[in-house]
Amino acid sequence: MKQKVVSIGDINVANDLPFVLFGGMNVLESRDLAMRICEHYVTVTQKLGIPYVFKASFDKANRSSIHSYRGPGLEEGMKIFQELKQTFGVKIITDVHTAEQAQPVADVVDVIQLPAFLARQTDLVEAMAKTGAVINVKKPQFISPGQIGNIVDKFKEGGNEQVILCDRGTNFGYDNLVVDMLGFGVMKKVSGNAPVIFDVTHALQCRDPFGAASSGRRAQVTELARAGMATGLAGLFIEAHPDPENAKCDGPSALPLAKLEAFLTQIKAIDDLVKSFPELDTEH
C-alpha cells in the first residue's frame, strides 16, 4: 500500500522509508546546554546515517504546577533555534500553544507541533495550517487512534496536508499510560497512510496522583522503543539529557545522553530489518 511522504527540506518522512529521528531535549534549559545536546545528536546520527530533526520546547505552557520551569519564551527560544540551525545545519521541531505563536515560530523552525492536550482546538489548528509548515500532531492520550482522522481533516480543510502523526501513549486508568501498538496501523489507515512516529519518551510517563511533576520509567525506554519500531514506523521521537536526574522537565523519562549511540544502533538495526521485508497483506 502506498505510503504518504512528507518532506522536511531534504528529509523524506514515510512509514516505508528509513526512520527519521526527532530528538533533543524536553525544554530549552539554556543556550549552552542546547548547543551541547544538539551537537551530540548530530554527531551520533551522522555516524549512524540516521536522518535527524532537533526537538526542544521554548515554552512548556502545560506544566502541572505554576511553579515549574517553562522555558525561555518565544523571543529567546527563537534566537537559540536560529543559532542551532546556523551552527549545525539541523532541521528543528517545536510546539506551539496559541494561534498567535504559529506564524512567528514557523518562520524559524521546520516543523511545528500540535500538543496532545490542544489537538482538538480548532482555532489553533487553523492558525497552524495557514503557515504552510510541516505539522506534527501529538495524538491526545484521551482519544482513540481512529479519532485522529478528524484532526487530520481539520488541517486538510485549512489547506495543509503536510501532516505527521505522533503516538505518545493512551490513558490507562488514572495517572498511567500504555502504548497500543495496534493503534499505529489504525492511525495510518484513517489518515491516508500519513507518516506515524512514536514518542517513546512521553509514553514512559507515570504520575504521582498527588504530586506536581510526572515520574517516568526510563529503565524501559529501550524495550519499548524496540517494540514500537518493529511495527514499521516513519520515525522515533526521543528526548535525552546529560543529567536526567537534574533535568528541568521530564528527567525520569529521558534517555541518558551518553547512551544515545548504543540506543540508536539497536533501533536502526530493527528498522533496517523490518523494512527489508516485503509487504504482507493478511487482511485478504
Swiss-Prot record:
Keyword terms, alphabetized: Cytoplasm, Lipopolysaccharide biosynthesis, Transferase
By its UniProt entry, which Gene3D superfamilies does this protein fall under? Aldolase class I
Pathway this chain belongs to: Carbohydrate biosynthesis; 3-deoxy-D-manno-octulosonate biosynthesis; 3-deoxy-D-manno-octulosonate from D-ribulose 5-phosphate: step 2/3; Bacterial outer membrane biogenesis; lipopolysaccharide biosynthesis
| Cell location | Cytoplasm
- Annotated coiled-coil positions are none
Q: What is its EC number?
A: 2.5.1.55
Q: What class of enzyme is it?
A: transferase
Q: Name one GO cellular component term.
A: cytoplasm
Which chemical reaction does it catalyze? D-arabinose 5-phosphate + phosphoenolpyruvate + H2O = 3-deoxy-alpha-D-manno-2-octulosonate-8-phosphate + phosphate
MF annotations from Gene Ontology: 3-deoxy-8-phosphooctulonate synthase activity
Question: Which Pfam families does the entry link to?
Answer: DAHP_synth_1
PANTHER family given in the database record: PHOSPHO-2-DEHYDRO-3-DEOXYHEPTONATE ALDOLASE
Q: Which family does it belong to?
A: Belongs to the KdsA family.
Any idea what this protein is called? Answer: 2-dehydro-3-deoxyphosphooctonate aldolase
Q: Which organism is it from?
A: Cronobacter sakazakii (strain ATCC BAA-894)
